[in-house]
């Protein structure tokens, strides 16, 4: 279609658009002053001029567009990749194609020009200062330098985005145009396009507006865009003027409207609780993007509130719609001036409106929601007007209350006389005014009579007083009842019905007057009542539960006050310790007006509404009150206050420690409510611990403080039910807790607005919460504006179901969890927000947008955050990031984490100085669309892909057609591993290409700008290899581009053999390896084992983390071992190793072999000699059977030694039997022999007879060998020894040794048994050591004792060494051989060698014996002389010679008692001794015998002391010698006897001559000394038998071997 007169057509379109703009401006903009209007007109004129220029340019472009259709179609197809996803059903018209083709061509030219300029400037910069390799510490300096250089360059070639560019922002790239008209045109187009992106998305989602308008040609599109730009510019100017001048809103002249955003403050209890810096920073960040005049916000709000098909309306048009004053019903309050909508009108509490009126005038200044002029601004007008009416009427009501009391000036005075005087003056004043007021007094000491009630004669009972009031006074007079100080017990319920006005006043205030009762106290019906300065306390009773609390005839539902269609004001009162678990609040209001001011509710308990219960179109005003520790016992809840189907206004009040199941402090159930400047602390409940908002309610919460409220389910601060509209402004939420949402939990499908509020948490938190704000209802709208969220450990916004979150001009900092969690078709919009200093230890992003949800982020700043990622989006979701800034952040994954067909659109982004792991900006699975345009990436670091990291494919197929990368700049980016800009984790599925992009100084540690994942590998396996030769195998990995696979360590290589095909080869060593960042991998210490000549294929498998694998096979042949080595099959089937046997060294074998042969010859010779001389007495002396047993044991030991030269399973089993037999045979034989000697010594028998009977020997030895035999049999059966190899693969050596898993149990038992025998034998040897054989006799038991010692030492030494050097073949060989050979040599030397010596050297032995005897005689003679010398010396000193030495001690003799005829008489015995025998006469012939006995005893004692043994044979010999001496020396004996007899006789006669006694004593001592020095004769030493009383040997008995 060709237009012949285009200028006329353009002019008509321009006029139409101008009229539309004027109309929209009049409807939606704010009226400014004349100066601002002039400025706007000038701006509009300028824009109109620009639009004319744009139209001319567009016409010129259209006239110059004459390209070929095929080429145009190709270009258009590339351009529509982005648009194709939104509208696939319709194809653009020819006019639209021409328009887009011309546009694309021009943009391509501009991009090329811009690219060339950038490259030239970069080259200049590099030539001036050589760039260093990127390092993190130089990042800030590099960026600053680059910014300074690039800013000049960009300003010369690029016109930045005009509506968001300022000096604090970095570079935002838009389309590059050079001419002024093109810049202005592009400026308007960009602004319009940005504002329309949200509108287009919403309209397309609901299939209302197509992406491409087919009904208009390209000229009309341009004109419409210009007109829209004019409108937008006007709106922006108006908004700026509005923010600076605080103008009033359009169509509303109310002076009480909202002020500008810069003057807003958050005030709670007259204290500024928000930092001025925070408020100023929040206000300063507001731009024209999101406000009442902005096109994008207006479109979103209009769409959400005016569309009929989306199921969401902005206002709740329900029967209890409290903001619509034009839908009045017949339900009119009969008590006060309110209609059913509860809109307070001006003058409602004025004196002129005291009478009840049936009709009510409309409120002024309100708008009809159904009016066509209803818009976003007028909505706030409704709220502001309603709030203004509340404030005005509350002030009027308080003033009216104080005026009606009449005594506000004298209320606090406690002087009664002063009060009486003031009252008289007041009464006189009232009479002059004509006011009918009647005053009554009540006192505890008053009396009830007809004349009571005055100040002098007060009444006692209030009920009596009210009953006595005349009917006329009830209707026409104001009754004021004063309570004197005291405590009043109300015993009967007081009913006040149809009174005009009753005022109950406590004189001197609430601290002096208290009302109490044990039942319900007051009922007010159709009455105006004031309660001032009273305390109601200690009311405790129970009443029956109420079935229907809303029946009008069911009166008495409140514990203290019941209001029915009445007006009540409570001022300066206290309600304490009131309990009625079946009541509806301490104060119950039904269809009434209740005002409570400066009042305390403490420790009140009720079923529902612990303090106040307002219902059924009541109006409840609570001002400056405190609710503390109130409880609602019924699950309906309302710990402090409930307002049901009523209007509630709370201001400057505090709620502490209240408790209920639902609504720990306040429940709002229907109606319009305002909570202003109040505090909620330490309240608890199941839900809504501070405020519970039930369905069909509209609540305005402003300037409130919520601190440490606890909910066991959710909504610790506020819980909203369905169909509620909630406005939260200038509030602070701090340290609240619930398992759900600790700030706000909403099930409303309508509107929740939060503005200028602070949500503060603790890190670490005292108690963890799931979220801060939670929207659980479908199709809900959450609007957050100018708020701050910091210090939270839970999710801040939890948006479920298809709901909408719009957040603007808000701050998020120092949080440690997600910001948004949205799923199930939710819509998230963030505009002009800042996120900084946040951290997230979880694996998901701080914005989680899943399950077909959409996220739009415009002009958002992210800086100094340490998180896993910013955006996590899965399952067909969409994310838009427009005109934003991401700087100085640290990501554990990447900024975007998307998968499962999720689309990403990034435009005009500054991404700088960020550190990330896999994927700096985007990490995608290639299943969704990606568009990154007009963006700058500078100074970023990542492990892989600073721009995009393409992860492994998910279950969906890749969507390559939707990848768009255009007009981007990449500067100074660095990758720790590979892929500086783009990295494909898998093989390339979609090619990466960037149109008109610039890349400068981007580096990677290992790879290039673009790298891919693992594709294939190669190895260095040889074709032939000996068995088990250590050989490394080197692998190298490659990517899909044929380059080395760099920067990754995620490939696992396995080397294996297919045993099903090749079962004659085995593989050991490090057969698994992991790839390194340098692409190389090594199999270390690989041993391929098999019999020489085996052929097989080795398989190398590369396992990827996607559970995929790549397999390559290599043929290999096993060849023979090297010289000096043999193949050994160790460790398994076909596990051959080329090893050197080092089990027994040659030197050890030679030495042990020669030694064993020599010992064997010695044993053989010994056996032969023993057999030959078996009948000789010297052999019979030891018992030949005993010697034969010893030789048999030696043979077992020698056999085991020779067997140990070969280590096989059979030899191990033989040795396990022979070695224990050897030791136990030897041990048992010598033990029995030694035990025989011990028995002889203990029995004091003839010591020369040490032979053992054969039967005794065999029986005893068999008995000892029973236990070893059993243990050896068990070891052979249960723990059989077998051969085991001990090899060292590094040294390539092998050793064979005997091994049994559980043999150590048998060994321990054998060792314990062996050592028990040996230790007992050692003890016997020690016991027998005192025995000294006669010189020249053969002492065999001495050699046996030595042999026992030797055997014990051998075992004690060898067993620890064997355990210390366990599993050593050489140690095993030596320990089995050396101890056995040493013991056999000891046996031959100690048992057999002495016998052979006696056999072959008899003469020599006798000669030696004689020489020994002669030597002993000489020694005896010398000893005699010494003793005589001692005796002579001691005799002169009158001392007993026997006491000179311990050998002559008579202590043993003196200790004995017995007859004087005993042979054992002490040598020291004298007649002077104090014994019982001193006076007995002794015959003369007995004295010699006594002397002889004394001498004999002395000799016996000497022998015993010297030998330490009771040797009876020596005693007998000494007796013989002494008798001979007595016979040879009769003269001496007679003289000594005579002298002794004389001494005895003198003593017996009783004479006491000292000289004679001394003489006798000296003679007796001489005789005793003489006899004591006598020695045995030599012949007695040589006699084998004793001469005195000894038993002769039988011929069969063996004598000493010397006599043989």
Curated annotation (Swiss-Prot):
GO terms for molecular function: G protein-coupled GABA receptor activity. Residues 1573-1584 have a biased composition (Polar residues). Residues 1563-1572 have a biased composition (Basic residues). Residues 38-72, 213-263, 1457-1604 are annotated as: Disordered. This is Metabotropic glutamate receptor-like protein R. Pfam families: 7tm_3 (PF00003). It is a multi-pass membrane protein. Residues 98-133 form a coiled coil. Residues 1171-1184, 1233-1256, 1326-1340, 1394-1604 are cytoplasmic. It is found in: Membrane. Gene3D superfamilies: Single-stranded right-handed beta-helix, Pectin lyase-like. The keyword Chaperone does not apply. Residues 38-69, 1471-1527, 1534-1556 have a biased composition (Low complexity). One of its GO terms (cellular component) is membrane. Residues 28-1149, 1206-1211, 1278-1304, 1362-1372 are extracellular. Residues 1-27 form the signal peptide.
């Amino acid at each position: 279609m060709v237009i012949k007169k285009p200028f006329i057509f353009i002019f008509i379109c321009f006029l139409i658009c101008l009229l539309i703009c004027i109309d929209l401006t009049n409807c939606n903009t704010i009226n400014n002053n004349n100066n601002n209007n002039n400025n706007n007109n000038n701006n509009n004129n300028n824009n109109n001029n620009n639009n004319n220029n744009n139209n001319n340019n567009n016409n010129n472009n259209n006239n110059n567009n004459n390209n070929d259709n095929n080429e145009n179609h190709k270009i258009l197809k590339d351009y529509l990749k982005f648009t194709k996803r939104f509208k696939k059903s319709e194809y653009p018209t020819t006019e639209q194609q021409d328009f887009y083709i011309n546009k694309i061509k021009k943009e391509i030219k501009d991009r090329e020009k811009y690219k060339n300029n950038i490259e030239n400037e970069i080259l200049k910069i590099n030539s001036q200062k050589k760039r260093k390799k990127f390092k993190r510490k130089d990042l800030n300096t590099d960026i600053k330098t680059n910014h300074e250089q690039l800013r000049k360059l960009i300003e010369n070639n690029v016109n930045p985005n005009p509506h968001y560019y300022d000096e604090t922002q970095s570079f935002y790239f838009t389309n590059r145009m050079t001419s002024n008209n093109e810049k202005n045109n592009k400026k308007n187009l960009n602004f319009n396009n940005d504002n329309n992106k949200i509108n287009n998305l919403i309209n397309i989602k609901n299939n209302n507006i197509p992406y491409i308008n087919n009904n208009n040609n390209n000229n009309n599109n341009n004109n419409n865009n210009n007109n829209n730009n004019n409108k937008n510019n006007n709106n922006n100017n108006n908004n700026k003027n509005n923010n600076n001048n605080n103008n009033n809103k359009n169509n509303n002249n109310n002076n009480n409207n909202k002020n500008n955003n810069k003057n807003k403050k958050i005030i709670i209890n007259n204290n500024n609780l928000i930092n001025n810096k925070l408020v100023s920073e929040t206000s300063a960040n507001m731009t024209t993007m999101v406000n009442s005049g902005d096109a994008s916000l207006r479109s979103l709000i209009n769409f959400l509130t005016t569309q009929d098909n989306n199921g969401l309306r902005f206002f709740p048009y329900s029967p209890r719609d409290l903001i619509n004053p034009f839908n009045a019903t017949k339900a009119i309050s009969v008590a006060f001036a309110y209609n059913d909508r509860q809109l307070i009108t001006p003058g409602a509490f004025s004196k002129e409106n005291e009478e009840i009126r049936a009709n009510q005038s409309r409120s002024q200044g309100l708008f009809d929601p159904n009016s066509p002029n209803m818009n976003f601004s007028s909505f706030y007008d409704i709220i502001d007007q309603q709030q203004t009416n509340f404030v005005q009427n509350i002030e009027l009501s308080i003033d009216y209350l104080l005026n009606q009391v009449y005594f506000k000036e004298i209320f606090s005075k406690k002087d009664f006389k002063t009060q009486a005087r003031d009252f008289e003056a007041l009464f006189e004043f009232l009479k002059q005014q004509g006011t009918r007021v009647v005053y009554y007094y009540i006192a505890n000491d008053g009396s009830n009579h007809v004349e009571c009630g005055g100040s002098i004669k007060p009444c006692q009972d209030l009920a009596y007083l009210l009953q006595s009031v005349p009917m006329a006074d009830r209707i026409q007079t104001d009754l004021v009842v004063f309570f004197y100080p005291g405590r009043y017990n109300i015993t009967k319920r007081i009913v006040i019905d149809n009174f005009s006005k009753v005022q109950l006043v406590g004189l001197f205030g609430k601290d002096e007057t208290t009302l109490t009762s044990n039942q319900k106290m007051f009922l007010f019906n159709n009455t105006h009542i004031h309660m001032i300065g009273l305390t109601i306390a200690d009311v405790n009773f129970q009443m029956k539960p109420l079935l229907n609390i809303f029946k009008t005839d069911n009166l008495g539902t409140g514990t203290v006050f019941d209001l029915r269609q009445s007006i009540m004001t409570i001022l300066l009162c206290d309600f304490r310790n009131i309990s009625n678990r079946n009541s509806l609040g301490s104060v119950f209001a039904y269809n009434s007006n209740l005002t409570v001011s400066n009042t305390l509710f403490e420790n009140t308990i009720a079923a529902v509404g612990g303090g106040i219960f307002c219902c059924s179109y009541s109006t409840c005003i609570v001002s400056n009150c405190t609710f503390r520790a109130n409880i609602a016992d019924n699950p309906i809840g309302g710990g402090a206050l409930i307002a049901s189907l009523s209007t509630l206004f709370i201001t400057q009040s505090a709620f502490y420690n209240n408790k209920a199941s639902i609504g720990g402090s306040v429940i709002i159930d229907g109606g319009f409510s305002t909570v202003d400047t109040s505090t909620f602390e330490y309240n608890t409940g199941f839900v809504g611990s501070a405020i519970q908002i039930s369905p069909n309610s509209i609540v305005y919460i402003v300037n409130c403080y919520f601190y440490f409220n606890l909910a066991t389910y959710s909504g610790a601060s506020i819980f909203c039910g369905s169909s509620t509209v909630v406005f939260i402004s200038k509030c602070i939420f701090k340290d609240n807790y619930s398992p759900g949402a600790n700030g706000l939990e909403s099930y409303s499908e309508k509107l929740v607005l939060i503005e200028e509020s602070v949500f503060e948490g603790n890190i670490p938190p005292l108690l963890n919460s799931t979220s801060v704000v939670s929207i659980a209802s479908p199709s809900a709208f959450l609007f957050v504006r100018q708020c701050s969220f910091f210090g939270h450990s839970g999710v801040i916004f939890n948006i479920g179901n298809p709901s909408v979150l719009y957040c603007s001009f808000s701050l998020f900092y120092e949080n440690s969890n997600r910001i948004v969690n949205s799923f199930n078709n939710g819509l998230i919009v963030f505009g002009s927000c800042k996120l900084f200093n946040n951290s997230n230890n979880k694996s998901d992003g701080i914005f989680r947008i899943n399950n077909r949800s959409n996220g739009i982020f415009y002009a958002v700043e992210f800086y100094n955050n340490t998180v896993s990622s910013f955006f996590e989006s899965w399952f067909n979701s969409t994310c838009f990031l427009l005109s934003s800034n991401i700087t100085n952040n640290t990501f554990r994954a990447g900024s975007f984490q998307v998968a499962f067909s999720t689309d990403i659109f990034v435009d005009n982004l500054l991404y700088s100085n960020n550190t990330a792991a896999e994927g700096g900006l985007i990490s995608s699975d290639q299943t969704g669309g990606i568009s990154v345009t007009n963006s700058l990436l500078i100074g970023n670091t990542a492990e892989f892909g600073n721009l995009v990291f393409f992860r492994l494919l998910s279950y969906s197929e890749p969507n390559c057609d939707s990848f768009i990368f255009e007009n981007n700049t990449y500067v100074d980016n660095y990758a720790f591993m590979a892929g500086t800009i783009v990295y494909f984790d898998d093989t390339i599925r979609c090619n990466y290409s960037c149109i008109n992009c610039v890349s400068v100084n981007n580096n990677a540690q290992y790879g290039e700008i673009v790298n891919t994942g693992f594709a294939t590998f190669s190895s260095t396996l040889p074709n032939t290899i000996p068995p088990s030769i250590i050989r490394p195998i080197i692998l190298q990995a490659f990517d899909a581009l044929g380059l080395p696979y760099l920067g990754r360590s995620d490939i696992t290589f396995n080397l294996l053999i297919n045993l099903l095909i090749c079962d004659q080869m085995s593989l050991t060593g490090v057969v698994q390896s992991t790839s390194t960042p340098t692409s190389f991998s090594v199999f270390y210490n690989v041993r391929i084992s098999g019999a020489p000549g085996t052929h097989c294929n080795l398989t190398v498998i590369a396992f990827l983390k996607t559970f995929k694998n790549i397999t390559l096979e290599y043929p290999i042949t096993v060849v023979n071992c090297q010289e000096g080595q043999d193949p050994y099959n160790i460790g398994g089937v076909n596990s051959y190793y080329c090893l050197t046997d080092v089990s027994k060294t040659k030197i050890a074998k030679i030495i042990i072999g020669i030694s064993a042969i020599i010992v064997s010859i010695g044993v053989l010779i010994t056996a032969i000699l023993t057999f030959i001389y078996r009948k000789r007495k010297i052999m019979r002396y030891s018992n030949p059977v005993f010697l034969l047993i010893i030789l048999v044991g030696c043979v077992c030991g020698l056999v085991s030694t020779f067997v140990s030269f070969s280590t096989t399973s059979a030899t191990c089993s033989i040795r396990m039997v022979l070695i224990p037999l050897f030791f136990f045979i030897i041990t048992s034989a010598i033990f029995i022999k030694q035990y025989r000697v011990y028995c002889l010594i203990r029995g004091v028998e003839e010591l020369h007879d040490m032979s053992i009977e054969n039967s005794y020997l065999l029986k005893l030895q068999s008995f000892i060998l029973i236990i070893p035999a059993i243990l050896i049999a068990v070891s052979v059966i249960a723990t059989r020894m077998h051969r085991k190899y001990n090899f060292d693969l590094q040294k390539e050596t092998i050793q064979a040794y005997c091994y049994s898993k559980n043999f150590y149990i048998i060994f321990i038992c054998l060792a314990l048994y062996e050592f028990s025998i040996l230790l007992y034998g050692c003890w016997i040897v020690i016991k027998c050591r005192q025995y000294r054989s006669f010189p020249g006799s053969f002492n065999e038991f001495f050699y046996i004792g030595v042999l026992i010692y030797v055997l014990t030492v051998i075992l004690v030494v060898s067993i620890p060494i064997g355990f210390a050097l366990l599993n050593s073949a050489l140690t095993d060989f030596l320990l089995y051989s050396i101890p056995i050979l040493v013991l056999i040599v000891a046996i031959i030397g100690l048992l057999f060698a002495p016998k052979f010596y006696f056999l072959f050297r008899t003469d020599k032995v006798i000669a030696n014996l004689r020489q020994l005897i002669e030597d002993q005689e000489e020694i005896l003679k010398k000893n005699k002389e010494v003793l005589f010398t001692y005796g002579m010396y001691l005799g002169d000193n009158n001392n007993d010679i026997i006491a000179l030495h311990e050998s002559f001690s008579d202590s043993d003799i003196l200790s004995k008692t017995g007859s004087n005829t005993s042979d054992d008489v002490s040598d020291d015995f004298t007649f002077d001794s104090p014994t019982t025998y001193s006076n007995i006469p002794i015959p003369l012939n007995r004295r010699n015998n006594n002397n002889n006995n004394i001498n004999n005893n002395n000799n016996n004692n000497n022998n015993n002391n010297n030998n330490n043994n009771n040797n009876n044979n020596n005693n007998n010999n000494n007796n013989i010698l002494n008798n001979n001496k007595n016979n040879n020396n009769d003269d001496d004996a007679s003289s000594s006897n005579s002298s002794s007899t004389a001494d005895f006789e003198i003593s017996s006669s009783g004479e006491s001559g000292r000289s004679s006694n001394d003489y006798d004593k000296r003679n007796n001592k001489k005789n005793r000394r003489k006899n004591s020095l006598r020695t045995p004769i030599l012949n007695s030493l040589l006699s084998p038998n004793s001469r005195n009383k000894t038993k002769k040997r039988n011929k069969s008995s063996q004598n000493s071997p010397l006599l043989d």
